[in-house]
A protein has these predicted regions:
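Basic- and hydrophobic-enriched, low-structure N-terminal and domain-boundary segments
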Residues: 1-146, 150-152, 477, 488-489, ...
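P-loop NTPase motor domains
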Residues: 23-26, 134-427, 442, 452, ...
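A broad, low-specificity signal for short, low-complexity segments enriched in glycine/proline
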Residues: 96-105, 114-115, 120-130, 150-151, ...
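Short secondary-structure boundary/capping segments
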Residues: 180-182, 205-206, 445-449, 473-478, ...
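Flexible domain-boundary/linker segments
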Residues: 261, 339, 390-391, 439, ...
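Short loop or secondary-structure boundary microenvironments that flank
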Residues: 359, 363, 405, 433, ...
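Conserved ATP-driven motor cores of ASCE-family P-loop NTPases powering translocation/secretion/packaging/pilus
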Residues: 419-521
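Extended alpha-helical interface modules used as scaffolds for assembling large macromolecular complexes
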Residues: 505, 544-547
Length: 613
């Protein structure tokens, strides 16, 4: 209900009604002076009403007008006071179904059809959030087989708007979308945690001491099993953060770029065996001792000294805990994958790029790397937007995170706050879930805050009652008329009918369960809900370039970073990071076939490449 708007309308109507009432009062005053008896008064009134120009001012006119001006507003006030809490036809609720056609007209970008999100078969959503005053964060809920990828992720990816980050279970999106994105000029990068292809080195993005500490915190907290109690292990976790952050800070400031990786970090931990004999120093202690003599206030030294405050046996336990946090880097493939970096995360906000993170759908062991990438991506993009005056706080290229398998990848600790403020940086998140229960499990008491920061919710179907119940509740109630009939039998039989109003959920939980497979439910902030057809992927003009319509699948290129050194983003400006081109692929392919001509085998040329020459 909108009482303020309705009340203003009523006041205007009553004010307009006052004009004919004043005319009638003046006419009645004239008639009572000119005529005697009811019949003559009626005749004079009839003449005045037929010929308004006959109306004259007379001695009693002020009295009649004053009576109207006093009693009419009083009567209106009493009537409105009596009706203030009554809403005829809306006693139990005003929920109603909206129109997909009307939503489309209101929210689509009419100037450029490509600058739209695809929500349903008939609803488009402009990427210009300032025009429609809605954020671009979207929650997509659908059970297994409901078509989250086919009916939502793929159509929106084929719009080719800005930069994308895809969480890609099994690599389906990479195979389907990689080729068309490269064809359309979008740089494609793949981090494959199934086959251990691609390279991502979190240490390449360290720029401040705080970055190093946040990375250590992310390592410790995201490599723990989900069912690990949070309170009991806090001391060991904090101590591990101290040690790991000290080592990261040392590598960040003192080690060459080629050694700034997790393999070196693990090697340093393995060389930090604490002896009961205080006279015996391990190699790591000697390394930090030499650094302390050079710079007693070095941030790495301060962190390491804080770690060394513990008793010897306690330090041994902390070392074991830290090694357990990094045990996966003993794997040769995993160590190789994180030894260099080719993600170039800040550039996603500067040019169109697509980053595919391929995850195993049956094993979450290595998913924590995606969590660290999430954390660093948000940090890098926020820093880029906030620290570059000409961007005015918003990235020049929109960055969209298609977060499939949302519940299976740990999120940055402050994700709720990130979701609330990412709109102003020209970043949006598509949270893709199987049901509401997953969201409740992840965020406990804060799960409603996640939904609150998403102005659009799209339900594709499922088989979980809690989701049905939640959707039925937020759809609201409608007021409907009911008819009851009573019939009395016997020698003096009688019958009676009565009409009443009753409240009913706009859509009951069982009705949501019975939605057709080709239908979806769309809820947008400040709009009536809509049931519409799911978008048909084969209707998209770009689908012809994908395997879904007979196109060639994307094949991951050769390891073009295999013979290169690490490119540290802290030392290379984001806007000038080296461009990876097809020519480079061809050159590396040639060098593999002709190793005797490999220019980069020369150590001097390696150094030149590292300096960007």
């Amino acid at each position: 209900m909108r009482p303020n708007k309705d009340r203003r309308t009523e006041i205007i109507l009553y004010g307009l009604l006052l004009i004919p009432l004043l005319f009638a009062a003046a006419a009645l005053a004239q008639a009572t002076e000119q005529a005697q008896g009811l019949a003559e008064i009626t005749a004079v009134l009839s003449e005045i009403l037929h010929t308004p120009s006959m109306l004259r001012w007379c001695a009693s006119t002020p009295k009649f007008l004053l009576a109207v001006l006093v009693f009419y507003p009083l009567a209106v006030y009493c009537y409105m006071l009596d009706q203030a809490d009554r809403h005829p036809g809306a006693e139990h609720g005003t929920a109603k179904w909206g129109s997909a056609h009307r939503l489309n007209i209101k929210y689509r970008n009419t100037k450029d059809s490509k600058e739209n999100y695809i929500l349903t078969e008939n609803v488009r959503f402009s990427t210009d959030s300032h025009a429609h005053k809605h954020n671009l964060n979207i929650i997509v809920i659908g059970g297994s087989g409901s078509g989250k990828t086919r009916f939502y992720v793929k159509p929106n990816a084929l719009q080719l708007i800005g930069s994308y980050l895809f969480l890609d279970p099994k690599g389906e999106l990479t195979r389907t979308l990689g080729r068309i994105m490269e064809t359309k000029g979008i740089s494609v990068t793949v981090l494959d945690l199934v086959h251990f292809q691609g390279h991502y080195n979190p240490m390449a993005y360290l720029e401040t001491d705080e970055d190093a500490i946040k990375l250590a915190f992310a390592i410790v907290n995201n490599t723990k099993p989900k069912d690990t109690p949070s309170g009991g292990d806090k001391f060991w976790d904090d101590s591990s953060v101290l040690l790991i952050s000290a080592l990261i800070l040392y590598l960040m400031y003192e080690a060459p770029a080629s050694e700034q990786n997790f393999s070196t970090l693990m090697y340093m931990i393995l060389n930090c065996q604490v002896s009961e004999n205080e006279m015996v120093e391990n190699p790591l202690m000697m390394l930090f001792g030499e650094l302390e003599r050079r710079d007693p206030q070095h941030p790495a030294v301060l962190q390491f000294k804080s770690f060394m405050l513990g008793a010897k046996k306690t330090l041994q336990s902390i070392l074991i805990s830290a090694a357990a946090n990094l045990y996966m880097f003993n794997s040769r493939k995993y160590a190789e994958m994180t030894s260099r970096d080719e993600m170039f995360l800040p550039r996603m906000g500067l040019e169109q790029r697509a980053l595919f993170i391929v995850l195993p759908d049956n094993d979450t062991t290595f998913n924590f790397i995606a969590t660290m990438l999430y954390t660093q991506l948000f940090d890098q993009l926020f820093r880029l937007a906030d620290s570059t005056p000409e961007y005015n706080g918003a990235l020049p290229v929109h960055v969209r995170l298609m977060m499939d398998e949302f519940a299976n990848v740990a999120l940055p600790k402050n994700f709720k706050n990130i979701l609330a403020v990412c709109r102003s940086r020209n970043i949006s998140c598509d949270i893709i879930l199987q049901n509401i229960a997953q969201l409740k499990s992840l965020f406990k008491d804060d799960w409603e805050g996640i939904i609150g920061n998403c102005d659009t919710l799209l339900y594709l179907g499922g088989n979980e009652y809690g989701t049905y119940e939640y959707l039925s509740k937020i759809l609201g109630k409608e007021t409907e008329r009911t008819k009851s009939q009573s019939i009395g039998k016997g020698s003096r039989g009688s019958s009676s009918d009565s009409l009443q109003t009753a409240g009913r959920e706009l859509c009951m939980p069982d009705e949501i369960r019975r939605m057709r497979d080709d239908e979806c439910l769309l809820l947008m902030r400040s709009e009536d809900p809509v049931i519409d057809k799911k978008y048909n992927l084969l209707h998209h003009p770009n689908v012809k370039y994908t395997p879904d319509a007979g196109g060639e699948p994307y094949v991951m290129p050769p390891d073009y970073m295999g013979d290169a050194v690490t490119i540290t983003m802290g030392a290379v400006a984001a806007a000038t990071a080296p461009e990876i081109t097809e020519e480079m692929y061809e050159q590396l392919d040639y060098l593999e076939k002709h190793p005797e001509e490999n220019y980069y085998k020369n150590e001097e040329n390696f150094s030149q490449y590292d300096q960007g020459d």
